[in-house]
Amino acid sequence: MPEAIADAHITTSDLFTACRSALGSADSLLAAARQGVAGLVSRDGKVDNAAFEREQFAAHGLSWTTTYVEGLRQMLAWGERLQDAGNFRELEQLILRAAYGEYLNQLAGGLSLSQGEVLRPADMGVPAEAVAAFLTEDVRLLQTTGNTPPVRARIAELIADGDFGNPGFDDDMLGMVQDQFRRFCEDKVTPFAHDWHLRDELIPIEVVEEMAELGVFGLTVSEEWGGLGMGKMAMCVVTEELSRAYIGVGSLGTRSEIAAELIRLGGTDGQKEHYLPKIASGEILPTAVFTEPNTGSDLGALRTRAVRDGDSYKVTGNKTWITH
């Protein structure tokens, strides 16, 4: 296992030390952001709805910041898991290094929430001294040597043969699932996907039916409702493998995942009994009907309305397309 990686002389030991230190700094910055947003949206210790509406950019930014910091935490745990197993190769070291370099820079300089929205720490009420305290020696080391052109170029060289890094699964079953779906894609999807695209064809129903038999649509649905009950990680692994072959196939299972979770968490017992087994089996294929003219996927701005009329609903509005 190489000790020095890419252009800068950072040993494996130094990389882990810097990442652990930087994660602590990120946690402190997150605490300052949480305190800042609380000051913007709270009155007398409680969230004020009017203030929350007014400061939704800051509140939204706090969610992003929390996610970024948790991402750093999980990346470090991934690297440590591989190191303990003796599988922390040059590629995985570079991936960890690039991830920390990029996220630490964004946490200090701005998170791109969209093309026209960049969140700065000050937008969440974070004082300048908290940002200055965040920029420790280890944070600056990773910011300046992490996600650099030489690091990215070396990653590109290492993944050219199809090895995209060890995912570090802590469950052997996930590796088996990954292999199973990679074989399925190599046999049933990859050889045909480009022609489907060129001919603007729907994914053949035979492929969808085989995916249903493999359990794609019920991965996270509990066994009680006819699913596999395997959890979010399995769903991510399967989606990644299907998407590797063809993005259209990769998106099929995610709609079922979203619909099943919404019904499981908020549905009545009758709705669960009716829909969950059928979603898990692939008998029902949910779709996401979001996009509207002049709206995109801004769910807060949707104009379509459903009004109860006896035992049914009257739906009025315009949709541009749906996503399956």
Where are these regions (language model features)?
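Glycine- and other small-residue-rich loops at beta-strand/loop junctions that grip anionic moieties
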Residues: W196, D200, R264, T291
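Conserved protein kinase catalytic domain
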Residues: T239, A260-I263, L276
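Glycine-rich, Trp-frequent "lid" loop and neighboring beta-strands that shape
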Residues: F169, G227-L228, I247, G270-H324
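Flavin-dependent oxidoreductase catalytic core characteristic
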Residues: M1-W225, G229-K232, C236, E241-S243, ...
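Residue-level "edge-of-site" marker
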Residues: E224, R255, E292
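N-terminal glycine-rich flavin-associated loop
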Residues: G250-G270, G296
